[in-house]
């Protein structure tokens, strides 16, 4: 029998403590939802739950529609990674970790318009030269579950793009609440 992982006991309330190192590595924060699966071999599997990933195809279509109408690149992310990309290279963004700047914007629950950005991190650890960007957090039932990002490397954005990102975030939030 191979021994991998860490052994933990279940307390009298049925709780299991997930070690801090694992939580940090997987970016599991206090209050984050986890899915519990049981496979055929009797193994219990914990998976980080992303409510917005249920909207994966829908988010992709919405990103495509925004790109078609505005002509700027569009990204949609959950709390950890980008789940939809339109107008930019998918290999540069899709399933890549979001930056700390994006996490902070989601935690503040308010949209941002930066019209004279220089160097910005959208993907964790990768600086990009940008002219402007706007971010709208997707807040469902009071909790930030993702964000919509519209950015341009050569054009300046204004209130139209800012309102579009807020509208998209609000619409996706309402879809999640239903």
Swiss-Prot record:
It holds the Pfam family SpoVT_C. Residues 5-51 form the SpoVT-AbrB domain. GO terms for molecular function: DNA binding; identical protein binding. Keywords: Activator, DNA-binding, Repressor, Sporulation, Transcription, Transcription regulation. GO terms for biological process: sporulation resulting in formation of a cellular spore. It comes from the Bacteria. Disruption phenotype: Deletion of the gene leads to aberrantly formed spores. Mutant spores release their dipicolinic acid (DPA) via germinant receptor (GR)-dependent germination more rapidly than wild-type spores. Spores are also more sensitive to UV radiation and outgrow slowly. Residues 56-178 are annotated as: GAF-like. Induction: Expression is regulated by the sporulation transcription factor sigma G. InterPro entries: B_subtilis_Trans_State_Reg (IPR052731), GAF-like_dom_sf (IPR029016), SpoVT (IPR014213), SpoVT-AbrB_dom (IPR007159), SpoVT-AbrB_sf (IPR037914). Homotetramer. Two monomers dimerize via their N-terminal swapped-hairpin domains. These dimers further associate into tetramers through helical interactions between their C-terminal GAF-like domains. PANTHER family: PTHR36432, STAGE V SPORULATION PROTEIN T. To B.subtilis AbrB and Abh. Transcriptional factor that positively regulates or negatively the expression of a large number of forespore-specific sigma G-dependent genes. May provide a mechanism of feedback control that is important for forespore development. SpoVT levels during spore formation have a major impact on the germination and the resistance of the resultant spores. The N-terminal domain binds DNA non-specifically and the C-terminal GAF-like domain is crucial to its correct folding and function. The non-specific DNA-binding activity of the N-terminal domain is modulated by the C-terminal domain, which perhaps in combination with another unknown factor, confers activity and specificity. This is Stage V sporulation protein T. It comes from Bacillus subtilis (strain 168).
């Amino acid at each position: 029998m191979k021994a991998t992982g860490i052994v933990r006991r279940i307390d009298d309330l049925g709780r299991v403590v997930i070690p801090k190192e694992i939580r940090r590595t997987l970016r599991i924060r206090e209050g984050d939802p986890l899915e519990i699966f049981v496979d055929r071999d009797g193994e219990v599997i914990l998976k980080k739950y992303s409510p917005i990933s249920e909207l994966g195809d829908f988010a992709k279509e919405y990103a495509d529609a925004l790109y078609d109408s505005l002509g700027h690149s569009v990204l949609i992310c959950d709390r950890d990674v980008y789940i939809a990309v339109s107008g930019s290279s998918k290999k540069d963004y899709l399933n890549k970790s979001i930056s700390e700047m994006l996490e902070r914007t989601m935690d503040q629950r308010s949209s941002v318009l930066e019209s004279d950005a220089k160097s910005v991190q959208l993907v964790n650890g990768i600086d990009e030269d940008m002219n402007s960007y706007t971010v709208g957090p997707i807040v469902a039932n009071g909790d930030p579950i993702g964000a919509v990002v519209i950015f341009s490397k050569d054009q300046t954005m204004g209130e139209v793009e800012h309102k579009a990102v807020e509208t998209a975030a609000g619409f996706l939030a309402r879809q999640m609440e239903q």
